[in-house]
């Protein structure tokens, strides 16, 4: 049984940089890219929900229906990777919100980021709950074979009913 559809509002967020850095020893990566703020999947356990509260929005339904994207993401990434002082290290994509949520079909933000990664042969990892990741197999496959990319698909449970309750708008476990 599918979750009730939400009307999604998509708004641009004009970032100055695209690669976020962290120095926490508790996180398995020190560089990340999140093409979106907010996530249409609506996972009840999501730890990223407070990011909307920091913007004066609800971490509940606003987080699921008011999505922000970075239209200049690919250009910003290309600028950062081209800097003479850039030190190449693996970048994690999707550590905060899913890079392949439904709105990605329209924006292709994640796809444009992957195209830059491919041109620069920039190592990365990516995680999702969406079957939309298969769309980008033409990039992920060759880069994976070259040891430049790792792709992860998260499956919380194989129980479809429980998955729908926990992750109402994510791809079903069977499809993942």
Q: Each predicted region: which residue ranges?
A:
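Conserved Radical SAM active-site core
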Residues: 2-36, 44-152, 156-164, 172-176
């Amino acid at each position: 049984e599918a979750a009730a559809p939400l009307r999604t509002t998509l708004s641009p967020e004009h970032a100055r940089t695209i690669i976020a850095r962290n120095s926490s020893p508790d996180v398995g990566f020190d560089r990340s890219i999140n093409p979106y703020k907010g996530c249409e999947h609506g996972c009840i356990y999501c730890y990223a929900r407070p990011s909307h509260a920091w913007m004066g929005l609800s971490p509940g339904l606003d987080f699921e229906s008011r999505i922000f994207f970075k239209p200049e993401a690919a250009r910003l990434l290309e600028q950062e990777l081209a800097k003479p002082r850039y030190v190449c290290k693996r970048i994690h994509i999707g550590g905060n919100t899913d890079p392949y949520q439904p709105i990605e079909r329209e924006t292709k933000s994640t796809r444009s980021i992957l195209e830059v990664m491919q041109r620069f042969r920039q190592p990365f990892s990516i995680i999702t709950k969406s079957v939309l990741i298969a769309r980008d197999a033409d990039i992920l496959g060759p880069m994976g074979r070259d040891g430049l990319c790792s792709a992860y698909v998260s499956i919380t449970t194989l129980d479809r009913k429980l998955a729908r309750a926990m992750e109402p708008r994510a791809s079903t476990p069977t499809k993942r």
